[in-house]
Each structure stands twice: as structure tokens, then as C-alpha cells.
Amino acid sequence: MENRAFKIKVMDLTELEIAAKWALQEGWNPGLSDAQCYYQADPNGFLIGYLGDEPIASISVVKYDDSFGFLGFYIVKPEYRGQGYGMQIWQAGLQYLAGCNVALDGVVAQQENYKKSDFKLAYRNIRYEGVGGGEAPDCSNLVVLERLPIEEVIAYDSAFFPAKRVAFVNAWINQPDCYALGIKQGDILAAIGVIRPCHVGYKIGPLYADSAEHAETLFLALRSKVSATEAIYLDVPEVNAVAVALAQKYKMSLSFETARMYTGERPDLPLMQVFGVTSFEIG
């Protein structure tokens, strides 16, 4: 039998689309434009492993700055699992993020393995599933994010994330067929949210808000952009009981969970104002 060498390289965008297809096959239901948006966050932060000429493994290790990175897309094609290829690309990814506090959202089946690499549990994120439609709220303070100065949106996003993600946020709020809305309190941005098309339905994320009232208004505004026949998904930090209650109020059901884990200290973020996580893949 041919002895094929295993090689790891930085992905190009075409290869990131391959990893997105693997994520779809794993049941992770990525957004239709996720690969293009994620790539903007750190073009060097996506690794792919080839066995000969065949791509068989992936990992994303987005380095937002010199102190914080996010790990995701850790996938080995099923027929090649248990042969050490995953560990090789895992180690290459962590080497790229050396010196960073590294975060991930780990599926239940892998959480014990992540602990062996010094990841520590911070809290659970819960994916809720519901349906679109409903009346748009009567709110004169709603704004379209792409019409605001991008610096204003990035400044608000940065309060909820351990690092600035300028290129990513710009791509995220301008991706095709999404709706990116905010709420202004006077001249100040007080909430932001995005709903984007996925292979199945739509995902809301992020949903950040200064108050529960703003979060609910923005949730309803985003939900109303989608047909009542479409599924919608919202990924909620379980520690935010008000966010959980919002999902339950609108008859959303629990469909999936992850563990948010960090190698370093848990960042001091306003989780009580995080009503929806941006993405399980890159934070």
C-alpha cells in the first residue's frame, strides 16, 4: 500500500470551504458565508492536513492579537480518526497560538480531551432552536449597522470580546443575505445583532445588548426578517439566565451544547449582556 506523507499547511480560502463542508457533515450547520468571513479574522489562522494529495484534517486557530486566540474547526475525516493525524494538527495549531490565552467551544464528546491540553471549563453555551416570523417591534431606535461608522460597531463589539476584531466584524455585518441591526440610546449604540443564512435556517449571533429589553426588541426585529417556515438558532451562555429565559419565552428548544473553555484565565466579559454568541468556531 502507498505510504503517503502527512503534511500540514496554512489554508487558502478554497481549502477553508472544504473545512466548512466537513463542519456541515458533522451537523454543525455553518452559515453560507462563514468561511469568507472567518478568513478575514486571520488568514494565517486556518490549518489543513493532507495525506498525500488528500485533505483529511483541519483546525482553525485565529490569533486576534498577541494575547488571545480562538480554536475551532477541529475535524478529522471519519475514516482517518484514531491514527494520530488529529493530534498532529492540534499541536501545530496550539504552537501557532503559543503565548495566547486560547478559547474554544468544545462539543461534549471532546471536553475531557481538551482538559488534557490544559483547557479549563468556564461555562456552557446552549444552542436553542425556534422559528422565524412574527411582528417586527415598533422601535424608532433601530438602526442598520452597515450604515453606521464601522468604528462605532467595532467599539461596541470589543466590549464583549477579549480582543478587537476589526476585519472580521466588518465582513460579518456586510455578508450576503444577512440582517445586521442595532439599537441606539440617544447617540450611543446600546445593542447589536446579526441574523445570517445557514445551510439549515438562520442563526442569530451576536446578540449583545445593554439591557434585557433591548435584547428582546432586537431579537424580535431579527426574527421578523425570516419566514415563519424557517428555523432560527440562538447560542446562549447558560450563565445568563435572562438570555435563557428569552429563548424559552419564544418557545425555542434546546438542540445542542458546547463548553466554553480557556487555557488561561477566563476573560472578564459582561456575560449578562451576551444574549447570543457570535460563532462557536471563532468566538
Residues covered by each model-derived region:
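Contiguous mid-protein beta-loop-alpha structural module that forms a pocket-lining wall or clamp
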Residues: 78-150
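Basic, Lys/Arg-rich alpha-helical nucleic-acid-recognition elements, primarily the DNA-binding modules
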Residues: 10-11, 21-86, 94
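Phosphate- and divalent-cation-binding pockets in alpha/beta enzyme and binding domains
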Residues: 58, 112-114, 242
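Intrinsically disordered, low-complexity, positively biased terminal segments
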Residues: 1-5, 12-17, 37, 50, ...
